[in-house]
């Protein structure tokens, strides 16, 4: 179930009680999937999955899901916020945790470059990834090192292909802890080659 410009293969353990919901006359599951990195750190990701793809799901299940990274508008504390989740299209046999994302899209905001207090170059960017039927997903990206500098010099509207992992990152702002979901990019190329 590979799509040209948005593909994800993510395997991990279900760590929240699944909730069922209806959308457009179809029944879906929503749950959190925790994926271990090689470093030992963990990413806890949101998953939406049609029940046609996965009939039942329980906390503790080990799943390997193939699908797309999608963005949704979600109301949190009375404000509309961008929510990023894996939309599962296929279930595969779970062998080991993995987190692989390939995207092709367009920079839709000016990339934001900075150097961390530890001296590491970092660049945040928003990628618009087109879907069928004229819709787009807006997916936050984070680039590192020389790649961060290179991307920071790109213009809004530049088409790029990339590969990386979908990660969760928590931070504190105004005494409240928030979690963001973004793609930590490992490889990037300019243009629509999808050879990231």
Language-model segments: what does each one mean?
Residues 1-196:
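Single-stranded nucleic acid-binding surfaces, predominantly the OB-fold ssDNA-binding core
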């Amino acid at each position: 179930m590979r799509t040209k410009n948005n593909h994800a293969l993510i395997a991990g353990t279900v760590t929240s009680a699944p909730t069922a919901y209806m959308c457009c006359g179809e029944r879906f599951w929503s749950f959190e999937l925790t994926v271990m990195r090689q470093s030992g750190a963990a990413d806890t990701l949101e998953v939406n999955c049609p029940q046609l793809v996965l009939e039942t799901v329980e906390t503790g299940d080990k799943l390997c899901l193939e699908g797309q990274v999608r963005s949704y508008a979600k109301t949190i504390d009375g404000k509309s916020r961008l929510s990023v989740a894996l939309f599962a299209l296929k279930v595969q046999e779970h062998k080991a945790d993995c987190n692989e994302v390939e995207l092709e899209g367009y920079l839709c905001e000016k990339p934001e470059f900075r150097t961390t207090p530890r001296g590491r170059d970092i660049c945040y960017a928003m990628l618009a990834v087109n879907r069928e039927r004229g819709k787009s997903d807006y997916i936050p990206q984070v680039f590192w090192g020389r790649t961060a500098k290179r991307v920071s010099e790109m213009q809004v509207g530049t088409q790029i292909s990339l590969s990386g992992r979908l990660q969760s990152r928590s931070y504190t702002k105004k005494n409240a802890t928030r979690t963001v979901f973004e793609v930590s990019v490992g490889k990037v190329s300019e243009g629509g080659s999808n050879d990231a």
